[in-house]
């Protein structure tokens, strides 16, 4: 029992450490919520402690094994040395994961290790690995010494049989309660969803245990068919998407269209900037000088301030952009890694007569993105490491500046109209910035200023300025090229960032909007000479349908993406956002519906305080009175229906099935 309590105390101590570390953000919440979350977390800690103590208890209280306990003890101690090492290693990873993503470590993080070279390289270049290993060794040594002391007392104790029986019964009783996780008369065991009672990420994080969370978020090895849920959701989804011939029996989302376009086969260049979070840019705060060029470019372009990544992490964001389906995959680590979602009918394929290009400074094998594109995009040419002449800068390959300069040279050589997707990576840990660039402003403000805008380090701030600089130099070069005049540039970020900025309203962060809001800029001095702020809301799934509309190509769209410039949808449209470990969001220019687990009330409706979406007040969202209103119920239904439809689309968007519909001889 002492050993069990010892293990429990370790976890509680680490939880207190997490509470102290995050107190600045947690102190904004009520004591009641903090206490409840801490109590739930302590119960999770007790469960993990109980499971960890099982090997010892089996040897102690099994009659034919206990007599050999003295001989078994060294091997048992060796087992716990290994267990302690993994235990502390998980907590180190958990704290690092939370520092970067504001969420406790989950199985999606394990998926990142599949790209072993990049993952280990990033860890080595970002974190003080040697110091952390020393901490690991010291902590494990201390825990092992304490465990050895407790085990020695048991070996040399001369207890009567009755005492051992009493101890065994008491320990078994405590063990059952701790594993069950409920310290009262409750007819179901402690479940992960109880930690989500508040609807706030910070409170939820306090209530979770990283080991339990890894187990709860592990991918399923099977797909749970949701056909019936998708069929029920179909009428609303079909109406929302504008399906021309809805058929609930076939559950098809086919839409056929062709706009006049803006010109004769304009080139399309899509640039996706790593972690280009709106709330860390000059686009939201004039005082910030992180993205001065991007700010200037927005005043010469179509600028969409109400634009959001459809999902978090780069792999999910890029899958959403490429396919037009929000990556809501909960059965595998990400859809790009799921063999059952590899066959997709893409709008990108509708660009007949276009040269299709994908460029990245590192290796295109990351997260199996190469597989997604090669399998689904006819005639695509991928340019990645090994092709570029510039030297490798860090784990992510060549720098954004070098990638964009070489991309410009490559685009200049194209003989046919082209559509190119360029993926940048410099604004990512370890935030490497080359030294000695003559016209790069290396000025970094003081720590107080950095904290005000949620920059964790001076290097992060400088890396964002370098990214903006790289973009500026690219446009300077592109304007001298032969392709520039007939090219439409679409610029966005893959996702936002997790750090909560004191400069935005609390509700904005509580809804996790800071993790998803990114800029969208459509630039063409020829086709859009007049700048305009586009108030309609959009998301990553809309990029290729919008590009197709601009190019005037014939489109067969079977996904959730829509043309942002299609006037038939109007300004009052919603975009769907898949959140990490929380139900999805539905956001418009005016409203935000936050779906939540039932423990957190089932959902909440907010209204933006300021309709001026470029104003800093745009991050202020106010609770709407009458949460049972017609609007609330409507948005809750749309949210649920789009969620089910997105899951269904992931597994039922095969190219062959889409081709059947386009075949003139095909009859429904």
PLM-predicted stretches and their roles:
Residues 242-668:
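Solvent-exposed soluble domains appended to multi-pass membrane proteins
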Residues 115, 199-203, 207-257, 264-265, ...:
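The feature marks either
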Residues 67-72, 80-83, 100, 163, ...:
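A broad, low-specificity signal for short, low-complexity segments enriched in glycine/proline
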Residues 10, 113-117, 208-211, 227-230, ...:
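Alpha-helix initiation and N-capping motif
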């Amino acid at each position: 029992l002492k050993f069990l309590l010892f293990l429990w105390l370790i976890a509680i101590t680490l939880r207190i450490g997490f509470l102290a570390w995050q107190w600045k953000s947690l102190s904004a919440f009520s004591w009641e919520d903090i206490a409840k979350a801490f109590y739930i977390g302590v119960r999770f800690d007790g469960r993990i402690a109980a499971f960890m103590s099982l090997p010892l208890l089996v040897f102690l209280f099994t009659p034919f094994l206990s007599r050999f306990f003295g001989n078994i003890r060294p091997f048992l101690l060796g087992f716990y040395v290994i267990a302690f090492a993994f235990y502390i290693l998980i907590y180190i990873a958990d704290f690092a994961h939370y520092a970067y993503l504001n969420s406790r470590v989950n199985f999606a993080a394990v998926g990142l290790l599949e790209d072993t070279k990049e993952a280990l390289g990033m860890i080595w270049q970002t974190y003080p690995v040697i110091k952390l290993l020393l901490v690991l060794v010291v902590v494990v040594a201390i825990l092992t010494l304490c465990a050895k002391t407790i085990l020695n007392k048991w070996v040399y104790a001369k207890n009567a049989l009755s005492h051992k029986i009493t101890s065994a019964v008491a320990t078994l009783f405590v063990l059952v309660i701790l594993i069950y996780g409920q310290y009262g008369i409750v007819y179901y065991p402690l479940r992960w969803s109880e930690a989500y009672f508040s609807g706030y990420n910070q409170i939820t994080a306090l209530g979770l245990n990283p080991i339990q969370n890894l187990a709860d978020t592990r991918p399923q090895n099977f797909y749970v068919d949701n056909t019936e849920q998708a069929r029920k959701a179909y009428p609303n989804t079909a109406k929302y998407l504008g399906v021309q011939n809805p058929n609930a029996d076939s559950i098809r989302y086919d839409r056929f269209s062709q706009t006049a376009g803006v010109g004769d086969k304009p080139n399309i260049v899509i640039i996706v900037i790593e972690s280009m979070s709106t709330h860390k840019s000059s686009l939201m705060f004039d005082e910030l000088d992180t993205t001065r060029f991007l700010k200037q470019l927005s005043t010469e372009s179509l600028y969409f301030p109400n634009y959001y990544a459809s999902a978090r992490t780069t792999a999910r964001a890029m899958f959403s952009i490429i396919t037009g389906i929000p990556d809501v995959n909960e059965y595998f680590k990400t859809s790009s890694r799921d063999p059952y979602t590899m066959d997709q009918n893409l709008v990108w394929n509708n660009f007949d007569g276009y040269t299709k290009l994908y460029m990245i400074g590192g290796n295109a094998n990351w997260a199996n993105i190469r597989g997604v594109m090669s399998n689904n995009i006819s005639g695509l040419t991928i340019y990645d490491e090994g092709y570029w002449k510039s030297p490798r800068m860090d784990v992510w390959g060549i720098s954004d500046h070098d990638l964009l300069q070489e991309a410009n040279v490559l685009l200049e050589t194209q003989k046919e109209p082209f559509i190119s997707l360029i993926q940048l990576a410099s604004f990512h840990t370890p935030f490497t910035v080359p030294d000695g660039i003559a016209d790069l402003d290396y000025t970094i403000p003081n720590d107080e200023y950095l904290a005000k805008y949620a920059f964790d380090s001076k290097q992060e701030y400088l890396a964002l300025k370098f990214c903006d600089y790289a973009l500026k130099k690219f446009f300077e070069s592109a304007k001298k090229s032969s392709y520039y005049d007939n090219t439409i540039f679409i610029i966005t970020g893959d996702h936002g960032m997790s750090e909560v900025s004191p400069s935005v309203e609390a509700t904005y962060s509580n809804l996790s909007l800071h993790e998803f809001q990114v800029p969208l800029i459509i630039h063409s001095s020829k086709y859009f000479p007049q700048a305009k702020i586009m108030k309609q809301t959009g998301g990553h799934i809309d990029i290729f349908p919008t590009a197709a509309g601009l190019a005037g190509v014939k489109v067969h769209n079977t996904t959730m993406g829509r043309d942002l410039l299609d006037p038939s949808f109007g300004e009052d449209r919603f975009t769907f956002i898949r959140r990490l470990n929380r139900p999805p969001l539905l956001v418009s220019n005016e409203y935000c519906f936050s779906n939540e687990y039932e423990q957190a009330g089932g959902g909440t409706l907010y209204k933006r305080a300021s309709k001026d979406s470029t104003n800093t007040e745009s991050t202020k969202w106010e609770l709407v009175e009458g949460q049972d209103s017609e609007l609330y119920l409507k948005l809750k239904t749309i949210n649920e229906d789009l969620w089910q439809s997105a899951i269904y689309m992931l597994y039922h968007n095969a190219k062959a099935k889409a081709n059947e519909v386009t075949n003139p001889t095909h009859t429904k």
